[in-house]
Amino acid sequence: MIEERLASIMAQSGRSLNPLFLRTRLKEPLQDEVLAFVYNHPQYRSYLFTGGTCLRKLYGLPRLSEDLDFDVPGQPDVASFVADLREYVSETLQYRHMTTRVSGTGISVTLVFPVLRQLGLVHSSADTPNLLLRCDIAAEPTGIYGAQVSPLSTAQTMFFVRAYDLPTLFGSKLAAFLGRDYTRGSSQTQPFKGRDVFDLMWFLQKAQQQEWKLQPLWPRVLALLGADNAVNVVRRAADKAASLDTEQVAADLRPFIETEQALEAFSTNIHEVLPAQLKALEKALLTRQDGQLT
């Protein structure tokens, strides 16, 4: 079942497709299977789906995403999760070659599928034969969130996913843009993910189209950042946006954007668009504050 679906994606993909993008695309049916397992299982269906894959599958984010992220109210039982998932893949999906690795912190589970050789994507000894899917399972950090249950249809079935709502995800993304400690290689001096830049711009576009009725869940943002003022948070974000290295943004996004033309167009316009969007959000916040005082 798994091999056939991956082979179908290969057959539909053009030969000129960016190989990094292709490997990410191959993860999508694997993501669907893990999500079906999680949300059809009585022990795990309370998990809160979050992150870029949540935004793509439930809210239409126009880029690929590679990992599955879950927040858990309470303390996650990762050992049971791994054992139950291995049984599901082996017995229900009839795929018996998957192995798993758990990180030293115990919150990151990597699923290893040795499928790339038979798909024709191993060309030398330097190429890995393994397609990796990471699941990050963490305790929900603040207790401040909104959640909703949404149907998710895949090629095989439909099930119901418990996920953060858009204001919560917007707030988490803004906090990640400012607070994430991530660098890609030794040449990156400022910590950020290009994916956070893309996603934040997408959120701000949606919010602006709704005349700023869509806002980050500000109590969550302030709790995650240890901040006390929404306007100051937005100003910090605008300062960071103005100083981004666009080549590093593009390098991080390359496995998730289909064409180099689209990637170049995005990275070329970051410094003009993102600070302006954040300035507009600041103006909307100040206008709202003035309205509350009168």
PLM regions: where:
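Structured mid-to-C-terminal alpha-helical surface segments
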Residues: 1-47, 58-61, 73-294
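Anion-coordinating catalytic cores for phosphoryl-, nucleotidyl-, and glycosidic chemistry
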Residues: 65
